Amino acid sequence: MADSGSMSEPGRSHHPLAARAASTQDAALRERRAAIAELGDALRELVELASATEVPADVLRQVAAQARQAATRLGRQTRTRTELPGADDLAGGFRMYNLVTGSGSALAPPLHIEVAGQAVVGTCTLGLAYEGPPAFAHGGTSAMLLDQLLGYAASAAGQPGMTVKLETRYLAPVPLQTPLRLTAEVSEVTGRHVTARGTLTTAADPDTVLVEASGEFVSLRPEQAARLFGGIRPDATDPQVAHD
């Protein structure tokens, strides 16, 4: 079980494994992660402003051309789907481009997670880019956030796994541009199967639940992990690191 008050570092998508040491934090790796996070911040700002802007059409086209120029520079050296980013560390919990927590992801809020006793707590603010109904978040975004946090709770409890079932109940719309608070905790462990439950509220009113969810996660057998991840890199065949 994770220690109470353990803080998640930026870019960490799941709890570091107790049996595995975190990757060596050499200067070059720290610098690359910092640069990835800096680019991620800039891209998230661009995505948000692109969703909010009302500038004239000619300005939109100018910005589109500039964005394509930047994309060309980034595209000079890329990875494939079977190659992990050089800044990632599965055993240490670092997935820099994770869709929910990744500090390098243009699409992540990102969700910041910490361990608090037996529970895990996540905080984030959703901008206009996550809009579903006007002024409120898309329901799929709420499910995505809770799926990530429930999985983090499972890994923090020493039971990492992949999602096999997610049940979400929407009690009220989730407001945009409003600080949010999510909590999750493991409620049951049966063999390789783990059940976790969580809620989503605003930070200002944590007693009023907007969305609640229950997720079931299963730890992969070694042969399953090898089949799914064996072609990516050797330590990805370890079933203890096979999760989001």
List PLM regions with ranges:
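HotDog/MaoC-like acyl-thioester-processing domains
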Residues: 2-81, 87, 175-176, 187-244
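Hydrophobic beta-strand-centered segment that forms part of the acyl-chain substrate-binding groove
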Residues: 5, 9, 23-30, 149-181
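Long amphipathic N-terminal alpha/beta scaffold segment
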Residues: 60-131
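Active-site helix/loop of acyl-thioester processing domains in fatty-acid/polyketide metabolism
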Residues: 119, 137-160
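A structural connector/turn signal
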Residues: 131-132, 169
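Short, hydrophobic/π-rich interface segment
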Residues: 140-143, 147, 164, 173, ...
